[in-house]
Each structure stands twice: as C-alpha cells, then as structure tokens.
A protein has these predicted regions:
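Short beta-strand-loop/turn "lid" adjacent to the catalytic site in phosphate-handling enzymes
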Residues: 66-94
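Phosphate/pyrophosphate-binding loops at sites that engage ATP/ADP/AMP, CoA/4′-phosphopantetheine
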Residues: 61-75, 125-130
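Short, well-ordered amphipathic alpha-helical segments that serve as non-catalytic structural scaffolds
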Residues: 54-66, 188
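Active-site glycine-rich loop that binds ribose-phosphate moieties when present
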Residues: 122-126, 130-131, 164-166, 185-188
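Phosphate/oxyanion-binding active-site loops and adjacent basic polyanion-contact surfaces
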Residues: 52-56, 109-116, 183-186
Length: 188
C-alpha cells in the first residue's frame, strides 16, 4: 500500500500527516492537528511539565490509532526545536516509547532546517517555472530560530541560523512591557 504516517511535535502543536505513494506520486490522504503551547512552556521553564508530557503522550496514542486505521507501514514521530531545547526531552522519549511503542526522533537544527527547506523548495518548484535555474534566498522563520538558505540552480549552497525566533521575540517584548503596536514592530 505504501502508506506512511509522520507525526511532528513542534512549538505550537502536534501535527500528523498520512502519505500514500502511488507510482511516483506522493499524496497526503489525511491530516490531524492538536494545538498546544509546547514551545512557550519550554521557553519559560526549560523543560516540559508532567501535564504537558501526559498531554503529548495521549495525543500521540490517539494519532497512532488513527494512522493504524489506514494500515500504515510505518509511523515516524519527530520533535523539533521545543523538544530539542527541553532539558527533560529524554524522559518524553521514554514515555512515548512506553505508552505507544513509538520512537521519538529529536531532530537537530540542521535536520530540521533541511526538512523545512525541502518542503519549501518543492512548493516553489511547483509554483515557479524556472525555480531550479535561478539563485534564491529562502528565509525560514521558526518559533525558536530564523534560518537562511541560498539556493543556486536548485542546489543548497549556504545555510546559516540565528537563535532567535517568534517565541523569543514575543517573550522579549512581554518583558519590556511594549505596547501592542511596538510589540508587532519587534516581532515583524
């Protein structure tokens, strides 16, 4: 059947996509989203609370059950910046393994950026006729960082990363007691 499920634990929620491959075409056949503030909690506490770990586990188990309804061949669970930055991410990995039997892969910055750029590049290739024949700058603004990638004729030739993202900027503006107008300027 060539069906795969990918679950991403990110700063603003937990996301599931189920993909099916038919020939050379890969199609998303289902999606699910659970919104929760993981990144903000880690930014403030440097760890995940017991309740947040419990919530993440319950959502992962629920998404696994939904994916099994499609008879998926494999379920991949990965964590991004918020999970990587949590001091107790190893405990979360253990709990997910115990409760759902799934392995949580915590992506490093380079892996996370690579996947983001690949997804962006595929979208740009579809939307811009001669995308692979030009020089392009892709800026990826995440909740924990801002990344830049230079693409030359379809090949990624340079990457750099700044450790400040939307959550950090929001936290700074809160600490400075900025008005809404000034806060939006800082975050923009």
């Amino acid at each position: 059947k060539d069906i795969l499920c990918v679950i991403s634990i990110a700063s603003h929620g937990i996301y599931m996509e189920i993909f099916q491959k038919k020939g050379n075409i890969i199609k998303i056949i289902d999606k699910a989203v659970h919104i929760t503030q993981i990144g903000k909690e880690v930014l403030l506490n440097h760890k995940l609370t017991f309740n947040k770990i419990k919530e993440i586990n319950e959502v992962i188990k629920s998404m696994k059950t939904a994916a099994e309804g499609y008879q998926v061949e494999k379920i991949i669970v990965f964590g991004t910046t918020a999970i990587r930055e949590a001091k107790n991410s190893d405990y979360l990995q253990d709990q997910i393994k115990i409760t759902s039997g799934l392995d949580l892969i915590i992506l490093d910055k380079l892996e996370e950026n690579y996947l983001a750029y690949e997804k962006i590049s595929v979208a740009l290739e579809k939307g811009i006729k001669d995308y692979n024949e030009k020089n392009n700058l892709i800026i990826y603004i995440g909740s924990g960082n801002v990344s830049f990638s230079v693409i030359n004729n379809g090949i990624n030739i340079y990457n750099t990363n700044i450790e400040i993202g939307s959550l950090v900027l929001s936290d700074i503006s809160n600490k400075l007691n900025l008005s809404d107008k000034k806060r939006n300027i800082v975050i923009d």
